[in-house]
Amino acid sequence: MSGQFNNSPRGEDKDVEAGTSSFTEYEDSPFDIASTKNAPVERLRRWRQAALVLNASRRFRYTLDLKREEDKKQMLRKMRAHAQAIRAAHLFKAAASRVTGIASPLPTPGGGDFGIGQEQIVSISRDQNIGALQELGGVRGLSDLLKTNLEKGIHGDDDDILKRKSAFGSNTYPQKKGRSFWRFVWEASQDLTLIILIVAAVASLALGIKTEGIEKGWYDGISIAFAVLLVIVVTATSDYRQSLQFQNLNEEKRNIRLEVTRDGRRVEISIYDIVVGDVIPLNIGDQVPADGVLVAGHSLAVDESSMTGESKIVQKNSTKHPFLMSGCKVADGNGTMLVTGVGVNTEWGLLMASVSEDNGGETPLQVRLNGVATFIGIVGLTVAGVVLFVLVVRYFTGHTKNEQGGPQFIGGKTKFEHVLDDLVEIFTVAVTIVVVAVPEGLPLAVTLTLAYSMRKMMADKALVRRLSACETMGSATTICSDKTGTLTLNEMTVVECYAGLQKMDSPDSSSKLPSAFTSILVEGIAHNTTGSVFRSESGEIQVSGSPTERAILNWAIKLGMDFDALKSESSAVQFFPFNSEKKRGGVAVKSPDSSVHIHWKGAAEIVLGSCTHYMDESESFVDMSEDKMGGLKDAIDDMAARSLRCVAIAFRTFEADKIPTDEEQLSRWELPEDDLILLAIVGIKDPCRPGVKNSVLLCQQAGVKVRMVTGDNIQTAKAIALECGILASDSDASEPNLIEGKVFRSYSEEERDRICEEISVMGRSSPNDKLLLVQSLKRRGHVVAVTGDGTNDAPALHEADIGLAMGIQGTEVAKEKSDIIILDDNFESVVKVVRWGRSVYANIQKFIQFQLTVNVAALVINVVAAISAGEVPLTAVQLLWVNLIMDTLGALALATEPPTDHLMDRAPVGRREPLITNIMWRNLFIQAMYQVTVLLILNFRGISILHLKSKPNAERVKNTVIFNAFVICQVFNEFNARKPDEINIFRGVLRNHLFVGIISITIVLQVVIVEFLGTFASTTKLDWEMWLVCIGIGSISWPLAVIGKLIPVPETPVSQYFRINRWRRNSSG
């Protein structure tokens, strides 16, 4: 099955840039879906201007507010300008002070529990006043005033945290209040059709009281007004609930978890729990969580564009440029910061307090469905106009009959008040047809299903950042997945080791290693790491850092490494953080005897390639011959073939006097990486996640090809791919199925596009290789999902149709560029996201089929009846009730259907596949025609068929039966809509409690309206026989649906025939 789905789209059908049809200009139909990820605002604005929109305020209530987006951007620009103005003023003032010799005065200390007050520290930090900081004794002097130990952090007990929050505030900012319920009521009441109905209700009330008296004259007017009020309240309630859900999800997105140093150990806390005085480690890709100063760092560079608006990377150091602004991203290097300002006392906090956070997304499905609503609204408006014209003409020509069977209007005899009342009633019917015809429930259904899916996906360990990803994931044809932590457990242990050329019997036994060898090895491990080691109060050793770092640090501890002692005895002079491009990281360490060692650690074959010597058991440096190099490469291949990650550790000596002494020159100094001496090669085991093989198989069955893109050795990648089922057998492990990143990037663009679909595993790849693969796959028409965790993965995450960042190992930069965050870093959660994506799309289609059936049936019945008989069987109040069933209750019932395994048996939804499929057209046509036929027969022959001639209110009973049968038909048809392409429409129905509940509520309300609210709804009580007739009419839709599903449909979409004909006409013209 997977084979047929994985074939690339035909070149003649797809545009190479976006995977769109070659008939693109003719395909811009409201029934198609196009990708709008990263769509420019101007394009969205043009779409609105091009559409003829009816009731824009209501139609677009679920789409992006372009004006609000522009206001938000304007506020950002103002805040950035404000920050720059403050700094410019400070620089001017500082320059003047230097010229005149007058020092700028510092604000007075605040006293209290600390040696510095909030006003003073905020002033220094916000103005980036380096002079004032130096007067306090620099960073160390400031830390003393804040009672912070720069190595161990704050005490962090409850009393200490409380005092700091009291003195300096908390790391939160006042949120703008969300819109109140009454605001939603006001917005819902702005619908033009509802306003017209209210006016009509008032007119009907006034005329009715005047002509019929207070006792009976108020019925029609109050009934219409109450029905309109009910629609407004239900709409507002639904909108308000969705707003609260999205507000909660936005809160979850902002709640970043990070590590701080407290009481000598690393602890993970929420960003909201940071306090002034906290010591926070920073690594590449981290977001600076609060304002602060740099304590120490190595090649630390920060992207301040989020605050300054300038795309410039700023180098930071602890003496000249120590200030860090919250909200900025660490672009390179690492370091440690001391927090000086939190919450609204930071510029980021001020900015966030000024700009309200909206859901802000406009999904492709919402765009298209608003187009559908507009398109059908125009049809409804046209039909309503025709009905209004026909009814008015029939009325004034005497063809409209009254209850006694005579003409309702007689020229010169009918009173003006009665004419006005009759015209208001006619106009009300026409307006109500518009209300029913316009499927406003379509955008609501999208919002409901997205909100429901997002909430449920949180339980499945997936946090949706961009709404469009929910839909797009259902169309994914390929997933480019990382290996480490996604396909594997990320629980790494050193299980094999070569010391020099000697394989150790036990990787953690140091008894056979000479002391000098062990000493230089652990020195490099202790300094060349972003992890840390500390002892808890119980004396237990705890290790933090990435899984690879933890594995190597734990191994070094078993070899006898004293982490704290090594860090204090020797100091790191320069640091080169691990780079995913170079696959290695290094550090220059100055020992107590002033000798300098350059330590490197990274991918085994890459570090080994820079080694010219190795250290043997006698502590001698031995030349690395070709034979010895070959033997080590064989050992690496052997470990990789057993799915071990291979890491090499090497060093070299360096002359101390050649190290730059100037801080700026030192920051630009590149560590020498040649003539290295090999110390050790370790094999790290990271087992596959249980169940990942089944997940990969499930994707393949669903037509989604899983590709592994990893930085690991090609042999390691092959072994894991075979274990996970990405490669079926060894026979598949050859190019281009299995390829190295450097080979792929060496190809031309045309060659990459040609082979990209065959690639299953890419080993030793860089983030840029992943980006190139994504671009090639997209050019071939694929909908691409990509997983990533590193800062350098950001371009690929941004370029992909769906970017999936890892919640545990992922950097903040990667998360910010992603569409969905996988909270447990598990590939099984990625597959669940695919299921939910398909569920969103399927649920929308179910609701479209259901609602358009009602639209078509209601329109045809009223139009035919109006033109032929001069009256409509469904009154304004009845149509408003049907509208309520469709728009809100129907959307709730069908848009919240949970995903089923059946969804994963289908091929992915094509990028340009019509929203309304041929199966849906078939089902819709059969049900609508059945309802129209039966109800029109009842309208014209109902009195005789139902034997009502002897009853005094026969006409009212007949119309009540038509209304009741129409509603019950919709109840039965909701079951059909659950399973558009399955015979068994009841499968799983009892597990969907919401569906069962809504069906029950609809039935109960219908009974109440018919039996007890006759005056309100223009109905009369029905006897049990009439109820059986109505139920019988509705129940026939079930066997009819079964018969209909046996009728085959053509593969070519219905809309395609019209497009091809239109294209031919344009071509011939």
UniProtKB/Swiss-Prot annotation:
Keyword list, A-Z: Acetylation, ATP-binding, Calcium, Calcium transport, Calmodulin-binding, Ion transport, Magnesium, Membrane, Metal-binding, Nucleotide-binding, Translocase, Transmembrane, Transmembrane helix, Transport
Cytoplasmic side, ranges: 2-180, 241-369, 445-844, 896-915, 974-991, 1046-1069
Native species: Arabidopsis thaliana
One annotated Gene Ontology cellular component of this protein: plasmodesma
Superkingdom per UniProt: Eukaryota
Region Disordered, annotated ranges: 1-29
UniProt protein name: Calcium-transporting ATPase 10, plasma membrane-type
Residues with N-acetylserine modification: S2
Residues holding Mg(2+): D789, D793
PANTHER family per record: CALCIUM-TRANSPORTING ATPASE 10, PLASMA MEMBRANE-TYPE (PTHR24093:SF530), CATION TRANSPORTING ATPASE (PTHR24093)
Span list, region Interaction with calmodulin: 42-53
Any GO MF annotation of the entry: P-type calcium transporter activity
Coarse class of the protein's main subcellular location: membrane
InterPro entries: ATPase_P-typ_cation-transptr_C, ATPase_P-typ_cation-transptr_N, ATPase_P-typ_cyto_dom_N, ATPase_P-typ_P_site, ATPase_P-typ_TM_dom_sf, ATPase_P-typ_transduc_dom_A_sf, Ca_ATPase_N_dom, HAD-like_sf
Membrane-related topology note: Multi-pass membrane protein
Topological domain spans for side Lumenal: 202-219, 390-426, 864-874, 939-951, 1014-1023
Gene: ACA10
TM annotation in the entry: 181-201, 220-240, 370-389, 427-444, 845-863, 875-895, 916-938, 952-973, 992-1013, 1024-1045
E.C. number(s) listed in UniProt: 7.2.2.10
Catalytic activity, as annotated: Ca(2+)(in) + ATP + H2O = Ca(2+)(out) + ADP + phosphate + H(+)
Active site, UniProt feature: D482 (4-aspartylphosphate intermediate)
Location(s), subcellular: Membrane
Annotated function: This magnesium-dependent enzyme catalyzes the hydrolysis of ATP coupled with the translocation of calcium from the cytosol into the endoplasmic reticulum.
Activity regulation note: Activated by calmodulin.
Family the entry assigns: Belongs to the cation transport ATPase (P-type) (TC 3.A.3) family. Type IIB subfamily.
